[in-house]
Amino acid sequence: MAKLILTHEVTGLGAAGDVVEVKDGYARNFLLPRGFALTWSKGGEKQVESIKAARVAREHASLEDAQKQAAALSAKPVKLVVKAGETGRLFGTVKQGDVADAVEAAGLGRIDKRKVELPAHIKSVGSYQANVRLHDDVAAVIELDVVAGK
């Protein structure tokens, strides 16, 4: 077993600054070559403290940014122009990436498409609501206006 200090968040393992023990092969072939971790040493405690301090500062700043962006997203509806037939039925469906692109086009900032949660498949024009997880503690509800375009 190898004792490592994580420099980045690794899903299922820990966050930056955590000290973890993993199998030698996982450390040697995945974590260390990709720069996700450093080998543990006696002087590594200083590195752990600096990484954790940077993570706390970054999380605090990202929480404030997420709250500001959530207020902006909730205040204004986002218009999605999609191809649709005469009856209002869409040619395809609205996906998370479409919502993220529409938010960016509306000037409300960039959001990750993986953070968008659609209530159901959107297959016709109309008004819908979507949830966006901007931070672990911050979620915003976006009002989507799906309209027929070219």
Swiss-Prot record:
Give the stretches traversing the membrane: none
Gene Ontology cellular-component terms for this entry are: ribonucleoprotein complex; ribosome
Is NADP set as a keyword in this record? no
Q: Please name the PROSITE patterns in this protein's record.
A: RIBOSOMAL_L9
Extract one GO molecular function annotation from the record: structural constituent of ribosome
Q: Which Pfam families match?
A: Ribosomal_L9_C, Ribosomal_L9_N
- GO annotation, biological process: translation
Write down the InterPro entries for this protein, in alphabetical order: Ribosomal_bL9, Ribosomal_bL9/RNase_H1_N, Ribosomal_bL9_bac/chp, Ribosomal_bL9_C, Ribosomal_bL9_C_sf, Ribosomal_bL9_N, Ribosomal_bL9_N_sf
User: Which keywords appear in this protein's UniProt record, sorted alphabetically?
Assistant: Ribonucleoprotein, Ribosomal protein, RNA-binding, rRNA-binding
Family the entry assigns: Belongs to the bacterial ribosomal protein bL9 family.
Function, please? Binds to the 23S rRNA.
Give the protein name, as stated in the record.
Large ribosomal subunit protein bL9
Q: Native species of this protein?
A: Arthrobacter sp. (strain FB24)
Organism taxonomic ancestry: Bacteria, Bacillati, Actinomycetota, Actinomycetes, Micrococcales
